[in-house]
Design a protein with these regions (language model features):
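Bacterial N-terminal signal peptides
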Residues: 31-42
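Structured catalytic-domain cores with a bias toward divalent-metal coordination
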Residues: 45-327
Length: 327
């Protein structure tokens, strides 16, 4: 009823403005823009946003779960937080814990949840701080121990598939398809020693790529891996960020952390990067802190040993190397 009433007011005002003298053109436009903004804010204030069991009205923060029913294997329950700002704006999805032992990224989103004040937010933030529950509980790196699959390799998922596929399906439907922007967080697994970096997924669409490029620069990690060979088929998107990008929702992936540890600096990079990105998206007041001199990495090489054993590095992570160097 309230939306219909607002619409009627807008229609009547437009009719009235149409008959106003030409000399009042600028005033008419100003009034119309003000009325549209007022109506948009009024509708936003009256509406709530629900993901899973979490429902937040304007100016509220709500917690709940995404319930994944049992099928060929066990059910699972994923925590979700919805932060509904006090003012209209885009919907931003933040997802971490696809690999449950990448702790820095999980803790970073917990920090973001605690930091964000709905009164200061324009728009809505959906946060999934821990997706791979079994991996976290059993301390299993890389995969979901329930079905042995990585939770960042089976998007957009299957409604009747294994647990990993069902989780991916629900996230696609409940989160990806309802957001405007997305960030996928990683934190250096138990057997990884990584320097902080972002992924810039180039789609070939100039307008879309300009947005995702600005997103990685606004996030603030100065090393950026450029991915231009991601699957183009939305039905076989494979990665979470790619699932959003193939559906027209600008998305990036970020990583900070190493060896399954929680270091204050890594957590701060991810948490502060999130706030800077939200400023770029006009979801928080203030200006973003953009990377001024990014290092663009266009190629990733893997150096494999031809013998089994234990690897003892002689260089620190982030060290520049060249052919022939002992690493």
């Amino acid at each position: 009823m309230k939306r219909a009433y607002t619409s009627t007011i807008l229609q009547r005002t437009l009719s009235l403005l149409a008959y106003t003298a030409p000399a009042m053109k600028l005033t008419r436009i100003t009034c119309l823009l003000s009325l549209v903004a007022f109506c948009s804010a009024a509708v936003f204030a009256q509406s709530s946003f629900t993901v899973g069991t979490a429902t937040a009205a304007a100016g509220q923060k709500a917690t709940g779960t995404l319930e994944i029913p049992a099928a060929a294997d066990a059910a699972t329950s994923i925590p979700v937080v919805v932060i509904r700002g006090s003012k209209p704006g885009p919907v931003l999805a933040l997802v971490s814990g696809a690999h449950g032992t990448e702790y820095a990224s999980i803790i970073a989103l917990e920090k973001v949840i605690q930091t964000l004040d709905p009164a200061q937010v324009s728009g809505t933030v959906i946060i999934l701080p821990l997706v791979n529950i079994a991996s976290f509980e059993q301390k299993v790196p890389h995969v979901n121990p329930v079905d042995g699959k990585s939770m960042n390799r089976f998007y957009p998922g299957k409604q009747d598939g294994t647990q990993t596929e069902r989780v991916s399906y629900v996230i696609t439907k409940q989160v990806v398809e309802r957001c405007d922007y997305l960030v996928d967080y990683h934190g250096g697994d138990i057997d990884e020693n990584l320097r902080p970096y972002s992924y810039w997924p180039k789609s070939g669409d100039a307008k879309h790529d300009a947005i995702t490029r600005d997103m990685v620069l606004a996030f603030g990690l100065d090393h950026v891996i450029v991915w231009s060979d991601r699957p183009k088929d939305p039905a076989a998107s494979r990665y979470l960020d790619n699932t959003a990008n193939t559906r027209g929702k600008p998305a990036i992936a970020v990583e900070a952390g190493y060896s399954g540890t929680v270091q204050t600096d890594d957590v701060a990079l991810l948490a502060n990067g999130t706030l800077s990105l939200m400023r770029y998206l006009k979801m928080l007041p203030g200006a973003p802190t953009m990377v001024e001199h990014p290092v663009w990495l266009g190629k990733v090489d893997t150096v494999a040993s031809d013998q089994p054993g234990i690897f003892y590095p002689v260089v620190q992570r982030g060290t520049y190397v060249e052919a022939g160097m002992k690493i």
